[in-house]
Structure formats: structure tokens, C-alpha cells
Amino acid sequence: IMGHRMADLDALGSAVGLLCLCRVKERPARIVIDLQKNACQSLIAELKAAPGCEDLFISGQDALVEADNRSLLIVVDTNRPEQVECRPLLESISRVAVIHHHRRAADYIEKVVLNLHEPFASSASELVTELLQYTVEAGDILPVEAQALLSGIVLDTKNFGVRTGSRT
């Protein structure tokens, strides 16, 4: 699961939500992120400290080594190839899904197996939260995962001040 470079709380929050879905469905998954260059150090520290969450993160280079022809790359919070955390990883994986809430750019990620694009959503975290409502039980979501999703929504809505709707 990979967001954009200089990950913010929405990119990380939505990735953590999808990681929850993968955990519940017993599918191995990790978040591709640059642990030094991001805008969410405190959330990363909380996630690393949470029980059972020690091995959530992987570098783009390590993900390139681990990926094979059965891998699915889920890109969150961007639809532009030049903005992803690790472009070589994007280019090396044939099965890619994109979940984002931004307007479609002229240079978007093509040839995807799934494109969940909802420009009226407040955030990618909101979209993932909606997916979780239909795919996991409420008790399956860890408190730190719920916190990550809420952090992403709070960031992109400027504390629920803009771009909110009945779904938010």
C-alpha cells in the first residue's frame, strides 16, 4: 500500500485503514513510506509502538525486492505517477489499484485493476472508512487504526471546517 511522497496524515491514515482490511482478510500487506521524509512522524511512532504493529512499514527499495507477479499495489491519496512514494515500484507491478479523492490529473496512473475515484469525498481516509464499513466488523478495527483514519479526515477537512458532507 503506497501513498504520495512526503506522506501526510491522509495518505498514511488511508493506508493504515487498508492495512486493517488486509489484516482482517488475512492478506499480507505493508505500507511503503519514507520514514524520514514525511509529515506524520508522531502517528508513525504511535503505530510502531502499538501491539502487533511493529512491522507495518517497508521502504520502496525493499518493496521492489519483495514484489512478485502476484503482488497488488494499492495507491492511496494520489492518482499521479510522479507523486507516488516509489515510482519504480509502481512501474514494476502489473496489478495496481488507486483510491483517491483528488480531481483526475492529465497524467494519471493508467492500466489499473481498480480505480476508486470520488472527488466529492473529503479525503482518502473517508473513502477507506466507507470501504471498512462494508468489509470488516467494528471490533476488528484497532484503536490506533481508527485514530489514523480520523487523523486523515481531520487534516483534509481542516478540522471538519471544509469539504465535509453527510458521508463525512
Functional labels for PLM-detected ranges:
Residues I1-A7, S14-R27, R103-T168:
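A structured phosphate/pyrophosphate-recognition subdomain
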Residues I31, S42, C86-R87, I141:
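A generic "cationic amphipathic patch" detector
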Residues V32, I58-S59, I74-V75, P81, ...:
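Sparse, context-dependent recognition of short Cys/His-centered cofactor- or disulfide-binding micro-motifs
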Residues S42-L43, C86, I109, G161:
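Short, well-ordered secondary-structure micro-motifs
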Residues I1-N69:
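Anionic-ligand anchoring segments at beta-strand to alpha-helix junctions in alpha/beta enzyme folds, i.e.
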Residues H4, R30, L73, V96, ...:
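Hydrophobic "anchor" residues on beta-strands that sit immediately upstream
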Residues L19-L21, A49-C53, L90-V96, Y134, ...:
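A glycine- and small-aliphatic-rich helix-loop capping segment at beta-alpha/alpha-beta transitions
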Residues C53-L114:
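Active-site cofactor/cluster-binding pocket
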